[in-house]
Amino acid sequence: MAVPFRKTSKSAKNKRRSHLALSAASLVSCTNCGAMIKPHHVCKECGFYKNKEVKVVEA
């Protein structure tokens, strides 16, 4: 089984991992109730999408 010839330094390891960071989720406010939702998704609070009720939400 192959093994690394030299130890990977901390800086080389961190440079390799520099692109692995997660980005924050983008959120927008619902046009009907003002709750924060993902773009292009039905609002979980009121069931509206593009100013139309598409899902009945029980109170």
Swiss-Prot record:
UniProt keyword annotations, A-Z: Ribonucleoprotein, Ribosomal protein
Gene Ontology MF annotations: structural constituent of ribosome
Record carries keyword Ribonucleoprotein: yes
Annotated Pfam families: Ribosomal_L32p
Disulfide bond annotation, renumbered to this chain: none
HAMAP family referenced in this protein's UniProt entry, alphabetically: Ribosomal_bL32 (MF_00340)
Protein family per UniProt: Belongs to the bacterial ribosomal protein bL32 family.
PANTHER family per UniProt: 50S RIBOSOMAL PROTEIN L32, LARGE RIBOSOMAL SUBUNIT PROTEIN BL32
Protein name, entry field: Large ribosomal subunit protein bL32
Source organism of this protein record: Mycoplasma mycoides subsp. mycoides SC (strain CCUG 32753 / NCTC 10114 / PG1)
Lineage, broadest ranks: Bacteria, Bacillati, Mycoplasmatota, Mollicutes, Mycoplasmataceae
Gene: rpmF
